[in-house]
Every structure is written in structure tokens, then in C-alpha cells.
Amino acid sequence: MSKLIPVIMAGGIGSRLWPLSREEHPKQFLSVDGELSMLQNTIKRLTPLLAGEPLVICNDSHRFLVAEQLRAINKLANNIILEPVGRNTAPAIALAAFCSLQNVVDEDPLLLVLAADHVIRDEKVFLKAINHAEFFATQGKLVTFGIVPTQAETGYGYICRGEAIGEDAFSVAEFVEKPDFDTARHYVESEKYYWNSGMFLFRASSYLQELKDLSPDIYQACENAVGSINPDLDFIRIDKEAFAMCPSDSIDYAVMEHTRHAVVVPMNAGWSDVGSWSSLWDISKKDPQRNVLHGDIFAYNSKDNYIYSEKSFISTIGVNNLVIVQTADALLVSDKDSVQDVKKVVDYLKANNRNEHKKHLEVFRPWGKFSVIHSGDNYLVKRITVKPGAKFAAQMHLHRAEHWIVVSGTACITKGEEIFTISENESTFIPANTVHTLKNPATIPLELIEIQSGTYLAEDDIIRLEKHSGYLE
């Protein structure tokens, strides 16, 4: 039996679930059920397949977030491929194919390509379709999974099936772009069309050979990029300059629409790409009034709403069909039928050089996290959590001084030539232009308040004097 390696596509910045989804914390890292994130669920649902460790492909800027989420489910194993620049799905999958052939000695593994931000409600049907597709993939076919449509949907591409090549498997007649409503309705009524899920199964060599034949520029650039892989803790770093030369293209355009070896396997597993707040409402558990409620919420005489609150109490009276999402720094109120226009809010924030589209007030770092409590002219207050054993790299700031007050735990601090320890209710002052580090030597998290003061308080006022991951000494 061929080794099966999941390839999880975790790139993208996702704006359709703003304000929960941000550039630095996109939807694949969100939890839609209050427990695991979409990325974690994507990996966990593969457990019955007894597959190899997943290869996760992500943006360089999301690397520590991915690493922490994999660590939390015991799936971190030097298996995160970093894209130095975005080049769409065809090159990303090629990187995974090349890496898998390097990692699996004397084998040509099957690659199960999945998006990190999809929801599957019927996992048994999902796994059955994968097991069925393995037969065709081992024969050199490039299998795509077509979702049996439940309605006329204009937001998805479609796959038209051709001749049957076995039970519940067909050749691909054509891939079609997102249709208008009447065309989509015709597709659904014909029972010959499936939603294009963006999920695939094929041998690593089969994909690379088709890519080489159909898109040789992509193949060559990716081969060059993995020619000098630089392992970096849990990350696989490819050659940035070589990959920057790669054309940007999707797997559909570069390969699947042109190959003679495409096979579509239908799947009816309660799939959703969670592409909007309304689709999230569709798949979520509802109360008797068909409201989806997350947080401290009282909905009176209100129906068909999606209401989410991080911390504040929200009450509604006599409202229907709304999406209300409140985070620490933003509030979205929209008719459920208009949520596709949330992109206009993101565009507005970008045009006005605001931060609410980019990051949350709580920001994750390799050593832990911080949240902005308050800010004003020439000062900024943060609450910082440092993981056990983690530390800041040696650094200094040109334009700001810092006061550190320990709330709980113990901090081992290097300030200039001094090395000392402070504990709960103790503090220290770090002047500007002073080299300093901080480590949590304990087995419990370190909590501290940081008060910054100075003429320039942006995150880029930092001079790092050592390269440091934040995980180890």
C-alpha cells in the first residue's frame, strides 16, 4: 500500500470573516465550534486514514501560529513548508510533492491535498470517498473531489463529469468558472455537475510529471527552489530567489483543465468552504429561534441571526437575519444577505491605513502572546504572556523605554551587563538604547504588564542582536 501524505494548504489572508479573520490571523486559524481551529480539525479528521505526518504549507508570516496549532494536537514534526512569496496553488503543491519525494525514501507517496479552512460535517462519507479515490490515484490518475451540489450556487466553480470509469468515479469533461444563477440552476438540475472543492489525491510523481509537461516554468522554478532547502527548527525554508521567479497559477489552470488523466470522485459529506458569515450560519448549531449565538448574548424576539461576542454582553430585541460580530477593537453589523460586502469594509480600512484589517489586539509570537490594553500619546500598555522556557531575543529600542511589572511567575532579565530575576509584584525599567533579554525559567506561564513610553512606539522600533526562535535557549 502506498504511503499517504496529507498536504494542507494553509496560505491566504482571508477577509470574508472579518472582523474575526485578519491578515495576521486568517480564518483557517479560527475555531468555528469553540474548540479546535479549522486547520486542526482538517488534520484531526484524517486520523482514521493512518496517514503520514501532514505537510502544511503557509505564509512565512503565519509560521509560528501554524507551529503552535500543530504542537497543540501533537502534529508538529519539521513539517511546515514556508512560502516566501505567494504563488497560488500549483506551485505550492509542487513544493509539497518535491519535499515528499525527498522525505519518503524509495517511495512515491500519494498526496491528499486539502484546504485548511473547509468544514466537513459527515466525516465517514469524506473518508470513504478518499479510500475510493486511492485506487485511481495509484494508477496515475489525478483525482479531484466534486461536491454534490445542494443548491444553485454562484460562488463556486463547477466540474462537469464525463464517462464513468468505475463505480462513483468519472472522467472530467470540463472545469467551468463561477456561473450566473440561471446557469448554476441548470447545472444542478442536470445532475452532471459538481462543486469544485479544491481537494485532490494523486501520486507525487504523477502531479510533477503533468506539471512538467503542461507548465514547465512552474515545475522548473519549484525544482530550483527545493534544491537548497534550509531546515529551520519546525520549518522547511526554500530558496526565496528561485521561488520568486515562479509564475503564479492555480492547480486548475496549470494542470487539471489540461491533463488527460483527471478523474472526479463525487462526495456528499456536508462540505463547506465557510466563505461568508451566512455560510457559517448555515453550518452552525442553532437555538429554537434559529439564532447562532457565541458569547454572552441575550436575544429576545430575534430570529435567524448570527451573533458573536468576544467579551462584551450583547442584547438584541426584535431583529432578524442579522450578522453581529464584536471583537475587542471592531464591531460588524450586517444583513445576512449582504455579508459578501464585508470586503468593502476591509478595503476601507486599508485605504485609511488602519490596523483593524491586519491584526487583533491580541498578537501571537513564538515566545507567547501580547495584547494591547491601552494606548495614548507617547505611551502604550501591553499585557504579555511568555511561555515556560521561552525568551525574547537580545534586542534594543531606539525611541522607547519600557517598564516591566510581573503579575505572576518569574522573569530572568538581562539588562546591559546586569542579570537578575524579578517575581510577582516586582518591576524593572529598560531605558532606550539598552540591550536586554527576558526569559521565563519556570514551568508556568509568565504574565507581565509592559508600559512603553517614547516618541515612536511602533513594532518596527527594534534592533535584534541575535536570531532567536523563542522556543529554546
Curated annotation (Swiss-Prot):
GO terms for molecular function: GTP binding; mannose-1-phosphate guanylyltransferase (GTP) activity. Gene3D superfamilies: Jelly Rolls, Spore Coat Polysaccharide Biosynthesis Protein SpsA, Chain A. Pfam families: ManC_GMP_beta-helix, MannoseP_isomer, NTP_transferase. One of its GO terms (biological process) is O antigen biosynthetic process. Its EC number is 2.7.7.13. Signal peptide: none annotated. It is an enzyme of class 2 (transferase). Pathway: Nucleotide-sugar biosynthesis; GDP-alpha-D-mannose biosynthesis; GDP-alpha-D-mannose from alpha-D-mannose 1-phosphate (GTP route): step 1/1; Bacterial outer membrane biogenesis; LPS O-antigen biosynthesis. Keywords: GTP-binding, Lipopolysaccharide biosynthesis, Nucleotide-binding, Nucleotidyltransferase, Transferase. It catalyses: alpha-D-mannose 1-phosphate + GTP + H(+) = GDP-alpha-D-mannose + diphosphate. NCBIfam families: GMP_PMI (TIGR01479). Homodimer. Belongs to the mannose-6-phosphate isomerase type 2 family. Involved in GDP-mannose biosynthesis which serves as the activated sugar nucleotide precursor for mannose residues in cell surface polysaccharides. This enzyme participates in synthesis of the LPS group C2 O antigen. This is Mannose-1-phosphate guanylyltransferase.
